[in-house]
């Protein structure tokens, strides 16, 4: 999910690294598993006058865990909008990304039967948390043994809220998401990974096949998870059928005014749905989609589905924008296209949501327990893509005479305000002022610092191995760390990734003093001293410069908390610059890495000051 279509997205979904080409045949791609035994078959009918969906779900579930199942747990996410007392409403204070709630929504289960006709509703409970009915525990008449299955028939009625948090409607536009009773994921040990709908963080469920039959008024355009397989017309209604294999959610959108554009790239049929009158703006989204399918596919393994639907919602539907679903993404405006002026919105939103098709879609981590594994890695991947497309210095903002490096912008933005919690915490440990800066930006900065410091080739290999090994699986941070340790060495994650991500430690370092004085023998004695204030110890360089531009670099080993050097040379050095190549994006104050005895500050220092000025300009103008 993207943060917003304003300053935060402008500073977030940006970057300064380059993808490396891989051969078309990549032997490290893990073969896809057999189709999942869990099946959802849903018949649904939208009433646009009441903004309700009447649905019938036929669910086939196989217990693949190691323990018998005595109950089932269902997510009833739409009940998050039923009152002000739900967990979501209490934690979010009735808003998401600046869009305020303006009405209620919910889901009612009207029938819950086994295939043999046993009514399970009397044994179903939703009063598991005070004021919240986003989970349902269903007691079973008999345990389901490992390897055995159950078939359920569930009838439900979903009441969509005015859209402000992903799902809902505005006028006749309907984003139908988190809309049906969905099984929680049952972990291999037999525990149910069930949780309420939180104000921060998103979702987690198991892979399944989905068959959707979606009924809308005649003439309405529908986009949905999966590929359309059939279409019927009767009684003034259109019924469109969609099918998807090995996905862990299904969502759809319906609006009578959509325009359509199609393209095929990397073997994927892409369908773009957009408001009328904005045809000229679609080119930027198309470029982001083409570049993303190619570059993400090379880096993380090919996109495996035959279709991808991209929705650009109309004005007023900002609450639905910037969200990912399997094989369906919702991007955002604005729609102004000014020649010669690059601002990454809206194509950064498209790129971000496309990256989620890998990190959330294929690598299906728990978005509530470890949001850094989807939002953080997606943030970094998007930044990398935009740098490849627009160039390092243009990846955030590019106006005539004004450019801004994306990762530097993220570093500056992440440091503002009160200190942020560690990125590796669960989603509910954050509020709306810290979630983006920590989960999105901090994670991206840790990854980019690792890449710059230890080498792009090895970094790309480590993250690529993680993405491929965990495809169609449900990884934890330990799986990510294991992939990096396999490439960088057994203790790498303990030295760098764990302290930076799980404990929120920094790589702060500063120059303490520098002098370069004549020895009265035709040379100069130069003394330099620096100190680490952070506990993430990175290998660094200190660059000394003369007034005429001669440079000398001194290495600072990661095991040394303090740096001291004294040497004699023919040149007099007048300035020192710590980390001249800007590898360390975990240093909260890059300006204390400069010492100058020359009246004109070094060019690199000016560059840092200009970058700060650009960020302030962006903040004022947002």
Language-model features: locations:
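A surface-exposed beta-strand-loop module
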Residues: 62, 95-172, 560-573, 582-583
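Glycine/proline-rich low-complexity spacer/linker segments in large multi-domain proteins
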Residues: 84-99, 157-210, 266, 583-621
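Beta-strand-rich binding/interaction modules
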Residues: 224, 493, 507-510, 516-581
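Amphipathic alpha-helical substructures
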Residues: 302-304, 393, 434-522, 526
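Acidic/His/Gly-enriched intrinsically disordered linker/tail segments
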Residues: 319-322, 375, 379-445, 449, ...
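Zinc-dependent metallopeptidase catalytic helix centered on the HExxH motif
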Residues: 332-403, 463
């Amino acid at each position: 999910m993207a943060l917003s279509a304003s300053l935060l997205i402008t500073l977030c979904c940006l970057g300064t690294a380059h993808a490396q080409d891989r051969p078309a045949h990549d032997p490290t791609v893990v073969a896809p598993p057999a189709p999942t035994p869990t099946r959802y078959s849903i018949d649904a009918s939208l009433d646009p006058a009441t903004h309700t969906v009447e649905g019938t779900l036929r669910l086939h579930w196989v217990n693949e865990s190691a323990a018998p199942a005595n109950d089932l747990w269902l997510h009833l996410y739409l009940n998050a909008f039923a009152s002000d007392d739900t967990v979501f409403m209490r934690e979010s204070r009735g808003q998401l990304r600046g869009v305020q709630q303006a009405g209620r929504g919910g889901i009612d289960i009207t029938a819950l039967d086994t295939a043999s006709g046993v009514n399970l509703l009397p044994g179903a409970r939703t009063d598991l948390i005070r004021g919240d009915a986003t989970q349902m525990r269903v007691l079973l008449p008999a345990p389901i043994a490992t390897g055995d299955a159950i078939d359920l028939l569930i009838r439900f009625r979903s009441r969509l809220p005015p859209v402000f948090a992903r799902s809902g409607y505005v006028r006749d536009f309907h984003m139908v998401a988190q809309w049906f009773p969905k099984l929680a994921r049952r972990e291999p040990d037999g525990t149910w990974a069930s949780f309420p709908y939180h104000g921060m963080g998103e979702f987690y469920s198991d892979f399944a096949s989905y068959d959707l039959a979606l009924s809308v008024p005649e003439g309405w355009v529908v986009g949905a998870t999966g590929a359309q397989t059939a279409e019927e017309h009767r009684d003034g209604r259109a019924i469109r059928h969609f099918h998807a294999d090995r996905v862990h959610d299904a969502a759809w959108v319906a609006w009578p005014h959509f325009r359509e554009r199609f393209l095929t790239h990397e073997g994927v049929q892409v369908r773009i749905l957009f408001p009328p009158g904005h045809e000229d703006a679609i080119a930027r989204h198309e470029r982001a989609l083409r570049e993303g399918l190619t570059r993400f596919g090379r880096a993380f393994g090919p996109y495996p589905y035959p279709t991808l639907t991209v929705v650009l919602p109309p004005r007023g539907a900002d609450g639905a924008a910037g969200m990912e679903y399997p094989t369906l993404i919702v991007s955002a405006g604005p729609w102004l296209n000014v020649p010669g002026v690059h601002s990454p919105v809206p194509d950064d939103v498209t790129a971000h949501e496309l990256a989620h098709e890998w990190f959330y879609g294929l690598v299906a981590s728990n978005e509530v327990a470890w949001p850094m594994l989807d939002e953080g890695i997606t943030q970094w991947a998007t930044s990398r893509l935009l740098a490849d497309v627009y160039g390092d210095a243009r990846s955030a903002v590019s106006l005539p005479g004004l450019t801004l490096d994306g990762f530097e912008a993220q570093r500056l933005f992440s440091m503002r305000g009160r200190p942020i919690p560690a990125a590796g915490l669960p989603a509910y440990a954050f509020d709306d002022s810290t979630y983006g800066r920590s989960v999105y930006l901090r994670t991206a900065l840790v990854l980019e610092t690792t890449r710059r410091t230890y080498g792009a080739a090895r970094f790309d290999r480590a993250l690529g191995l993680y993405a491929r090994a965990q495809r169609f699986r449900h990884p934890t941070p330990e799986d990510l760390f294991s992939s990096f340790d396999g490439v960088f060495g057994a203790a790498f994650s303990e030295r760098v990734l764990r302290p930076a991500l799980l404990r929120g430690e920094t790589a702060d370092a500063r120059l303490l003093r520098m002098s370069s004085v004549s020895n009265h023998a035709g040379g100069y004695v130069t003394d330099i001293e620096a100190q680490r204030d952070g506990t993430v110890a990175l290998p660094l360089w200190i660059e000394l410069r003369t007034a005429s531009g001669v440079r000398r670099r001194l290495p600072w080993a990661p095991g040394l908390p303090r740096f001291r050097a004294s040497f004699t040379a023919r040149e007099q050095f007048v300035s020192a610059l710590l980390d001249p190549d800007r590898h360390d994006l975990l240093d909260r104050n890059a300006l204390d890495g400069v010492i100058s005895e020359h009246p004109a500050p070094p060019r690199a220092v000016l560059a840092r000051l200009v970058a700060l000025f650009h960020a302030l300009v962006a903040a004022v103008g947002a």
